[in-house]
Amino acid sequence: MNAPVVGSSLMVVHDTRCDYGAPVAHAHHAAHLRPPEDDAQQVQAFELLIEPAPAQCQGEVDAFGNWRHRFELVTPHQVLQVRSTSRVTVAARFGGLRPEASPAWETVRERLRYVARASFEPAVEFVQPSPYVPWPEPGLAGLRAWAATSLTPGRPVAEAALDLMRRLHDEWAYRPRSTEVDTPLSTAFAQRAGVCQDFAHLLIGACRLHGLAARYVSGYLLTEPQAGQPALLGADASHAWVQVWCPGTPGVPADGWLDLDPTNRLVPAAGHIRVAVGRDFGDVTPLRGVIRGGGTHSLTVGVTTRRA
């Protein structure tokens, strides 16, 4: 059991509504909405409300160690509403970070290469291409060359990863609604603009194309309103950032994963709540399902993150 976490107490309400053009007779859904717990994050309370009421709902841990809820709906419906409420205490995770003291990136890359009869390194799973970060793909040929500028010979891996994050933030524009969930990564690369999902996938691709392990993080970000302005309910959104494997780096947990937020050009601290990790967005979708019936549908999502 993890020791009590001393840090910021945050409350997150995540509302999802799906309206269908015709009745749904039967549905199975999976949700990644419950935050995990570790030495820097502790869940004080979590509630999941589903309407219509599911015939069954169970929580489980998926292949990547994330909480996942599966539920079945047998009541005919044209509206599905899911609300998760989380109260989480979050502490800064990377105190004393010394990126310049991390191993050379080539040394880390060698640890991730296959060697017969060598012990298995779980981070290897996050070096390979994945559905949202594919290669070889002609439209991403330039991403490898772009990343090489940061990965100079002998450079400490955490220092290189931080430089990639900063360059990505500085050279790409954050542009809401410039891409969709299924927009190819090559489009975001070519137009030099995207949303947080694109920024995360681009940083992941830049690392993997050079043999480094990187994985996608879904979660929430506390966005403080300007002085004198009230927080807008539902104006926040789920957020995405990246973890790069930097083993042996002072200030990074023993598992070696360093969090980087390229959308905001920072190392996540007590304002970021992790929910799930995976190879890319497809592994950590907040809500997905298989339905019988329904016809056309529209999705509405609202997230409110505030201090508890």
Q: How should these model regions be labeled?
A:
Residues 61-65, 77, 291-308:
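A general structural signal for short secondary-structure boundary/capping elements
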Residues 3, 166, 198-295:
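Hydrophobic/aromatic-rich core segments of domains that either
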Residues 25, 29, 38, 55, ...:
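Short capping/connector residues at structural and topological boundaries
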